[in-house]
């Protein structure tokens, strides 16, 4: 897994539990990224905030219900919630709309505070944020941001010599 970390400025200290935002779009969240986000939230004793970002086309009003997108988002958010609850984490799932994924993120950042943001980068041509969107996230994020990109060979089902058995 590749990790890119960008420190913008030291976020102001807030009272209350820490919050780790994991935004995703495109109908999937890579399980490797989810596992890493859960481990980070556990280490920081934080609430995991998975956020499904819905892109609303220009021909619709921004607050138009996107029933098909919500039908895709809810099972994904439930799966993330179950995984986090099994790990003993508090979960506060979100669905946010916008004209683009970055617009939806901006709307979410304006409404709530987050102590850390973990954004998934696509592996092997999968769904997710584009390189341009990831760059925007790094520049505009209000708190410490990690970009996680799973090993593309793992996405294809190939295991490289990464286990102790393979190395020995």
Label every model-predicted segment:
Residues 1-13, 86-117, 122-123, 135:
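Structural beta-alpha unit
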Residues 9-67, 92, 140-151, 164-168:
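Small/aliphatic-rich secondary-structure junction motif
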Residues 30, 73, 98-99, 127:
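A conditional alpha-helix N-cap/helix-loop micro-motif detector
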Residues 33, 60-63, 104-106, 129-130, ...:
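Short, well-ordered secondary-structure micro-motifs
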Residues 37, 80, 105:
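Aromatic/hydrophobic pocket-lining residues that form π-stacking "cages" and hydrophobic walls in ligand
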Residues 41, 80-84, 109:
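Conserved hydrophobic residues forming the short capping helix/wall of the S-adenosyl-L-methionine
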Residues 66-78:
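Short, surface-exposed alpha-helical segments at coil->helix boundaries
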Residues 118-141, 154-158:
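Glycine-rich, Arg-bearing micro-motifs that act as flexible, cationic patches
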